[in-house]
Amino acid sequence: MRTFLLAALLLAPAASLSAQTFDPEARLKELGITLPTPDKPVANYVKAVRTGNLVFLAGHGPCGDFNRPDIQGRVPSQKSIEQGYEIAKLTAICLLSSLKQEIGDLKKVKRVVKVFGMVLSDQGFDRQPSVINGASDLFVKVFGERGKHARSAVGMYALPFNITTEIEMIVEVE
């Protein structure tokens, strides 16, 4: 019993410290990232749906005008894997923007649960995970362990507006 109480007392300050230092928005600022205003949906849907403690985020591309050559094109014939990685990162920033709009404060994130990443791909290309790492790496940089998630990374023949990446996400929140 004494050992249990001692362990509880030793761990309690660490738990409260980690809760105090968890500040995803400060981390974004450290990374030089400013969240944009979320785009309006382009059809009859919403960007995020909260049910209970889960937020389901619709498929997102990079925020802003989709008719930009810098975010369009197939991997690897029109965009390199490295360019795809950066576009996936931009897509993740847009997802975080919609998530913040839905929940108000990114400190409410308990866990990034699932990421579904789609890459506009040439036939035979099989390195989609290397592209979607752009989003996954950002989520871990912003949320730490809470950002580690289950994931699918798949190739697509077509994506809306010829964008290079489209990503969906499920997040557990307080």
Regions found by a protein language model. Give the residues of each.
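Sec-dependent N-terminal signal peptides
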Residues: 4-13
